[in-house]
């Protein structure tokens, strides 16, 4: 591994200082594609939670979660602007491209963070607000500032930040947390490593160049393929827990098992390939499928709730 691959120091001179960007540039700071998945998983958390919630309160909660996720994205782009400037995939982001200054992004993200948390607390409840605040803190401080440039386990631990939205949604309805939202959290938490390591396999050169110790850079591609397979084997049983715990029914269990078989097949395809074009193709295939996979799993929970099909046929006697 090269010296650049173990550096964890920020180089704030690596990108140009621009002026006030357009509304589109500031919207891009929010990482809207990431935000859309966050909103959807939070919506499922709201939908499957017991009890009712006024539609206006539900909308407010989703808005706060979306703004909080966007704020996290803006603060992440502020802190990571130096490495974004040196990666082909991120070089055209607003800060490295000089359309928005780092200071503007930091102020923008901070204001949105405070707005999201305070609005959630005042208009929804303070349990959901506390979880939202912790999520923003975890993503910015624990993942972005501490783990990302220091350890190949950055995705494993830092992935918790992306797993909180359904728990926040649940808390917005109930004012508490329980085993059900924790299971939804666990699904996303276990999904994150194989999802991002698949990306890292065919982008490892970019990560090595900027000193981010992703698993392929530190431990090699063979170990990364092995870890993807192991985490995939752990993920599939976790996705079946909603049925065994009684808040998902036969539709969810059957479809999720089939989706899981597809995930395992693609993970196995990565595991048995050698470095090169075939590995990159297999990794891209799993990366793309993993996004659809998570979306469909949470969609199944939502559909069962809407159709009144969620049942206890598979529930364990706990």
Curated annotation (Swiss-Prot):
<feature type="transmembrane region" description="Helical">
    <location>
        <begin position="251"/>
        <end position="271"/>
    </location>
</feature>
<keyword id="KW-1133">Transmembrane helix</keyword>
<keyword id="KW-0997">Cell inner membrane</keyword>
<feature type="transmembrane region" description="Helical">
    <location>
        <begin position="58"/>
        <end position="78"/>
    </location>
</feature>
<feature type="transmembrane region" description="Helical">
    <location>
        <begin position="182"/>
        <end position="202"/>
    </location>
</feature>
<dbReference type="InterPro" id="IPR000537">
    <property type="entry name" value="UbiA_prenyltransferase"/>
</dbReference>
<feature type="transmembrane region" description="Helical">
    <location>
        <begin position="228"/>
        <end position="248"/>
    </location>
</feature>
<keyword id="KW-0808">Transferase</keyword>
<keyword id="KW-0472">Membrane</keyword>
<dbReference type="Pfam" id="PF01040">
    <property type="entry name" value="UbiA"/>
</dbReference>
<dbReference type="InterPro" id="IPR044878">
    <property type="entry name" value="UbiA_sf"/>
</dbReference>
<keyword id="KW-0350">Heme biosynthesis</keyword>
<protein>
    <recommendedName>
        <fullName>Protoheme IX farnesyltransferase</fullName>
        <ecNumber>2.5.1.141</ecNumber>
    </recommendedName>
</protein>
<feature type="transmembrane region" description="Helical">
    <location>
        <begin position="37"/>
        <end position="57"/>
    </location>
</feature>
<dbReference type="GO" id="GO:0048034">
    <property type="term" value="P:heme O biosynthetic process"/>
</dbReference>
<dbReference type="InterPro" id="IPR006369">
    <property type="entry name" value="Protohaem_IX_farnesylTrfase"/>
</dbReference>
<dbReference type="GO" id="GO:0008495">
    <property type="term" value="F:protoheme IX farnesyltransferase activity"/>
</dbReference>
<keyword id="KW-0812">Transmembrane</keyword>
<feature type="transmembrane region" description="Helical">
    <location>
        <begin position="155"/>
        <end position="175"/>
    </location>
</feature>
<keyword id="KW-1003">Cell membrane</keyword>
<comment type="similarity">
    <text>Belongs to the UbiA prenyltransferase family. Protoheme IX farnesyltransferase subfamily.</text>
</comment>
<comment type="pathway">
    <text>Porphyrin-containing compound metabolism; heme O biosynthesis; heme O from protoheme: step 1/1.</text>
</comment>
<feature type="transmembrane region" description="Helical">
    <location>
        <begin position="122"/>
        <end position="142"/>
    </location>
</feature>
<dbReference type="GO" id="GO:0005886">
    <property type="term" value="C:plasma membrane"/>
</dbReference>
<feature type="transmembrane region" description="Helical">
    <location>
        <begin position="100"/>
        <end position="120"/>
    </location>
</feature>
<comment type="function">
    <text>Converts heme B (protoheme IX) to heme O by substitution of the vinyl group on carbon 2 of heme B porphyrin ring with a hydroxyethyl farnesyl side group.</text>
</comment>
<dbReference type="InterPro" id="IPR030470">
    <property type="entry name" value="UbiA_prenylTrfase_CS"/>
</dbReference>
<feature type="transmembrane region" description="Helical">
    <location>
        <begin position="291"/>
        <end position="311"/>
    </location>
</feature>
């Amino acid at each position: 591994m090269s010296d650049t691959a173990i550096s964890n120091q920020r180089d704030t001179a690596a990108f140009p200082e621009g002026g006030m960007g357009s509304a589109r540039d500031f919207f891009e700071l929010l990482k809207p594609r990431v935000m859309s998945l966050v909103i959807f998983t939070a919506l499922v958390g709201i939908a499957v939670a017991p009890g009712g919630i006024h539609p206006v309160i539900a909308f407010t909660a989703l808005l706060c979660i979306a703004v909080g996720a966007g704020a996290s994205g803006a603060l992440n782009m502020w802190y990571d602007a130096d490495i974004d400037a040196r990666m082909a995939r991120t070089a055209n982001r607003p800060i490295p491209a000089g359309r928005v200054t780092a200071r503007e992004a930091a102020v923008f993200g901070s204001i949105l963070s405070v707005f999201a948390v305070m609005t959630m607390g005042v208009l929804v409840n303070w349990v959901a607000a506390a979880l939202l605040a912790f999520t923003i803190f975890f993503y910015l401080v624990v993942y972005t500032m501490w783990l990302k440039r220091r350890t190949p386990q950055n995705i494993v631990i830092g992935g918790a930040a992306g797993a909180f939205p359904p728990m926040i949604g649940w808390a917005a309805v109930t004012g508490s947390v329980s085993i059900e939202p924790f299971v939804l959290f666990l699904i996303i938490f276990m999904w994150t490593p194989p999802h991002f390591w698949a990306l890292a396999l065919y982008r490892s050169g970019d990560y090595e160049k900027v000193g981010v110790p992703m698993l392929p850079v530190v431990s090699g591609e063979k170990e990364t393929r092995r870890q993807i397979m192991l985490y995939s084997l752990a993920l599939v049983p976790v996705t079946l827990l909603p049925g065994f715990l009684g808040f998902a029914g036969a539709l969810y269990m059957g479809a999720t098992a089939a989706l899981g078989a597809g995930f395992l097949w693609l993970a196995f395809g990565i595991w048995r390939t050698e470095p090169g074009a075939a590995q990159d193709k297999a990794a891209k295939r799993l990366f793309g499928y993993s996004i659809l996979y998570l979306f469909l799993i949470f969609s199944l929970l939502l559909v069962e709730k809407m159709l009144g099909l969620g049942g206890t046929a598979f529930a364990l006697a706990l």
